[in-house]
Amino acid sequence: MGDVEKGKKIFVQKCAQCHTCEKGGKHKVGPNLYGLIGRKTGQAAGFSYTDANKNKGITWGEDTLMEYLENPKKYIPGTKMIFAGIKKKGERQDLIAYLKSACSK
């Protein structure tokens, strides 16, 4: 679907300030994204989520991430993620390809 190398660059530029993506990695301002794919919203152990994230009740996958990453506050009103989103579909596809590759168990 997307390009993993391009996705890595997007992660470094737009995500790494607040997120890690490594097994056993620490939470930053945002949760460690390792194991994100297939996990329900608000479920990274040891991270303090808003009720909005905990109660959304969806499982992260390509489709849900495509929608969320376009406009996080619209997808989960009340989230504390301050990122405005990635409007370009191709960039979202690249980022998701990277997340699936680098952050999967």
UniProtKB/Swiss-Prot annotation:
Q: Which GO terms describe its molecular function?
A: electron transfer activity; heme binding; metal ion binding
Residue numbers bearing the N-acetylglycine modification: 2
Signal peptide segment? none
Q: Say what the protein does.
A: Electron carrier protein. The oxidized form of the cytochrome c heme group can accept an electron from the heme group of the cytochrome c1 subunit of cytochrome reductase. Cytochrome c then transfers this electron to the cytochrome oxidase complex, the final protein carrier in the mitochondrial electron-transport chain.
- PROSITE patterns cross-referenced by the UniProt entry: CYTC
**Where does the UniProt entry say this protein principally localizes?**
mitochondrion
Originating species: Aquarana catesbeiana (American bullfrog)
Binding positions for heme c?
Answer: 15, 18-19, 81
| InterPro entries the record matches | Cyt_c-like_dom, Cyt_c-like_dom_sf, Cyt_c_1A/1B
How is this chain modified after translation? Binds 1 heme c group covalently per subunit.
Q: Which GO terms describe its cellular component?
A: mitochondrial intermembrane space
Q: Where in the cell is it found?
A: Mitochondrion intermembrane space
Residue ranges crossing the lipid bilayer per the database entry: none
Give the family, as the similarity comment puts it: Belongs to the cytochrome c family.
Disulphide bridges = 21-103
Q: Does the keyword RNA-binding apply?
A: no
Its name, as the record gives it, is Cytochrome c
Keywords annotated in UniProt: Acetylation, Disulfide bond, Electron transport, Heme, Iron, Metal-binding, Mitochondrion, Respiratory chain, Transport
